[in-house]
């Protein structure tokens, strides 16, 4: 990862077969994921090179991504909501967001704070975390039969209400609570964790009327458990 860093601090995530960085999303918020890995690795091992690369990645996110709120990754453009890379909302000028890249940037800022003790990184991380939390469901919509409170959507250009990534966000929220003691983050983590279990096809959820989702009926078998889940234990 460290050898692939660009001169502006970005670390590409997508490469051609010869390991040349793909031009699409070459300088994007996915840098947060790579930077977070290097920052944590530097903290655990004391590797000075990884630390320097992670700091450059953090400065790229701080100076380039945050001012424009350009939280782009592969899913924002090439998944179930395809659009051109130059797309933005005509009314607001807001670019497509995929909140996985927001989470990755949150993780990078937190790891840089833990690595350096510089509270400016933590402040930037909380700013990003607050943006990520805008995607959390803080009500249980009556027009869906499942219990959706506390779950997370995916993008600002698509219609998912709750998605499996909400279980990933639990750890990020808890770690920010541990560093800041902001109880809101812990409450949001608990709600997201509960929402993750609430979407499971298990007898407890059916008996408690939390959901009546049945694998193979309401959603495809191949969409759960890497295609290995069976009815009654699916997600």
Kindly label every feature range from the protein language model.
Residues 1-235:
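Glycan-recognition and catalytic cores of secretory/periplasmic carbohydrate-active enzymes
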């Amino acid at each position: 990862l460290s050898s692939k860093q660009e001169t502006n601090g970005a670390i590409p995530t997508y490469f051609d077969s010869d390991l040349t960085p793909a031009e699409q999303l070459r300088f994007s918020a996915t840098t947060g994921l790579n930077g977070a890995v290097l920052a944590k690795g530097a903290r655990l091992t004391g590797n000075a090179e990884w630390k320097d690369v992670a700091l450059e990645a953090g400065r790229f996110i701080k100076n380039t991504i945050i001012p424009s709120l350009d939280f782009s990754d592969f899913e924002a453009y090439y998944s179930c909501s395809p659009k051109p890379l130059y797309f933005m909302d005509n009314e607001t000028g807001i670019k497509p967001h995929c909140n996985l890249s927001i989470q990755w940037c949150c993780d990078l800022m937190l790891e840089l704070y833990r690595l350096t003790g510089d509270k400016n990184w933590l402040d930037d991380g909380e700013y990003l975390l607050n943006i990520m939390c805008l995607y959390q469901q803080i009500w249980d919509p009556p027009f869906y039969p499942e219990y959706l409170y506390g779950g997370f959507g995916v993008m600002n250009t698509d219609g998912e209400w709750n998605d499996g990534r909400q279980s990933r966000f639990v750890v990020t929220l808890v770690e920010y609570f541990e560093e800041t003691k902001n109880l809101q983050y812990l409450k949001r983590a608990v709600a997201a964790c509960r929402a993750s279990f609430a979407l499971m096809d298990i007898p407890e959820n059916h008996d408690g009327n939390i959901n009546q989702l049945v694998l193979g009926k309401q959603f495809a078998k191949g969409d759960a458990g890497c295609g290995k889940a069976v009815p009654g234990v699916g997600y």
